[in-house]
Amino acid sequence: MSGLKYGLMVTGPAYGTQQASSAYQFAQALINSGHHLVSVFFYREGVLNANQLTTPANDEFDLVRAWQQLANEHAVILNVCVAAALRRGITDQHEAEQLNLAAANLQPGFTLSGLGALAEAALTCDRMVQF
């Protein structure tokens, strides 16, 4: 069986747990196996994967930019739960202006969205996998 459409939900931060890095490795493996990764929904602490200000040490894997590159190369939609993101200090330019915040820090390639994006992925993908 090949060519399935997948959606992922990532609930772990970019650093500190294995959830996000395992999700990224899974994403790479399923794409390399001929499947289609439609979207990734970052929820709870997973929204920290979209923080543009994350700066890993030189000898560490840059997971934030790796997600961005994966999205660019394979047309993967990177959705970030807007409510969870705002609670954790992550915002795009529009929300920053609406809330009178000093700056935005959402990594390019990621999009703030609601739970509707997760529901849509669950309805349209053959498989949803949570990390």
UniProtKB/Swiss-Prot annotation:
SUPFAM superfamilies: DsrEFH-like (SSF75169). GO terms for biological process: tRNA wobble position uridine thiolation. It is found in: Cytoplasm. InterPro entries: DsrEFH-like, Sulphur_relay_DsrE/F-like, Sulphur_relay_TusD/DsrE. GO terms for molecular function: sulfur carrier activity; sulfurtransferase activity. One of its GO terms (cellular component) is sulfurtransferase complex. Its EC number is 2.8.1.-. Transmembrane segments: none annotated. The keyword Ribonucleoprotein does not apply. Keywords: Cytoplasm, Transferase, tRNA processing. Its main location: cytoplasm. HAMAP family: Thiourid_synth_D (MF_00390). NCBIfam families: PRK00207.1, sulf_tusD_dsrE. Part of a sulfur-relay system required for 2-thiolation of 5-methylaminomethyl-2-thiouridine (mnm(5)s(2)U) at tRNA wobble positions. Accepts sulfur from TusA and transfers it in turn to TusE. Heterohexamer, formed by a dimer of trimers. The hexameric TusBCD complex contains 2 copies each of TusB, TusC and TusD. The TusBCD complex interacts with TusE. This is Sulfurtransferase TusD. It comes from Yersinia enterocolitica serotype O:8 / biotype 1B (strain NCTC 13174 / 8081).
